[in-house]
Amino acid sequence: MNQQHLLWQRLRRSNLISIGCLLMFTVGILCLHPVANPRSIEAAPLASNPIKHIVIMVKENRTFDDLFGTFPGADGATTYKDPQGKTHKLNHQPDRLVFDIAHEHSSFLTAYDHGKMDGFSKLPGAMQPVNGKLVDVADSQFYQSDIPNYWQYAQTFTLPDHFFYPIQGPSFPNHLFSIAATDDDVDANPTGNNNKTNTWGCDDPKGTTVEERHSNGKVTHVFPCFSDFQSMGDLLSAQNISWKTYSPGVNKGGYQWNAYDAIQDIRETGQWKQHFANYKQFISDAAADTLPTVSWLVQPANVSDHPITSVCAGENWTVQQINAIMQNKAVWNSTAIFLTWDDFGGFYDHVVPPKGPNAKIEYAFRAPLIIISPYAKPHYVDHTQYSFPSMLKFTEKVLGLPSLGGLDKNASDMFNAFNFKQQPLPPLVLQQRTCPKYSDPGLSKIDWS
């Protein structure tokens, strides 16, 4: 096995890790099993709608307190309680961790601890070496100086502080919620014969399954390629509204986060060729004003913000993509960007999540979300309760689409974060910054395209 494959396997597995174990990287994502016969409820189109482009960017493995716990005016925390009930200051998180923290469904339950929110330090991978000392990095956070550009976006535009992950587990279900507003009770990543591929969906080899945990306690396993629930792509195609999913190529690092790979009527038909584009095309499409009405932008794994990668490098990549929109006045003046992350990643958050329709797996901790648009309320912290389906509810309402019939049906539409009558905010073109250098080689040499 060559060095490149070894490195990617470290970035691919989501197993439990201890200090003495080999360096590994979890890129968790859960697969949604379909919801049958979703009811279509017509949404009223937004009058005088200035939004012509909606961009959904989903990065990896963070909580609100991890990135914005010190943000002024937000519901953040700078301390945590340990399992003995003692209060401690949250540790300062380094730019790059040594390995991943466990964050599957069982890890959520451990961290949640029946609502006491004191079990994060018990997670495998929580204790890691930082500057020669073992530090509880699960109970840690970044400061403004560590992620200055993410903070500039949050300070300039709108920062919701009660935006919850739908599923108490890893990436896959939440990515599916970002395209379909449902997950049919899936609570884990696809596993089995896909341990040597970067796929979670219809491209998985036979024998791959994903777990579903139903509200009655029953657990089932299915192949992660679904045909009996609608995605937002289906709704858009039915109305001849343009859309694309931009991601790394098939079997490249990060491709598994392209949730449309799990939608059979898109992945296994001509729709895939029509609506799939390599992530490298996003910048040129923005520059040429050829972005579709709705875009999902999936990053390569090395700039995903997922441990073990550098958050500085991930922030720089994000700035590049958003700059491309802001540097084209016509595109910027008609765009709403939703920049969020996909699961809690094992990191602390202090807010007890609400219960969802399937209380066995819904909802999880708060996700960071920044709403970036000329029509986002400026310098605004939005305390409204949202979740991933709210981004789709916004899309439905802006475009006059029917409901997908999942959690979007009763979700808040995020209009509280916007003022479509305000003077459009100017673009905020940011500079990339110089990132720390690391001794272990290989990440920069992998073909992530």
Kindly label every feature range from the protein language model:
Residues 37-449:
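N-terminal pro-sequences and low-complexity stem/linker regions of secreted or lumenal proteins
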Residues 1-13:
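N-terminal secretory signal peptides that target proteins for export/translocation
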Residues 12-16, 47:
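Structural motif marking the loop-to-transmembrane transition
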Residues 19-33:
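Bacterial N-terminal signal peptides
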Residues 16-18, 40:
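Generic short N-terminal amphipathic or hydrophobic helices
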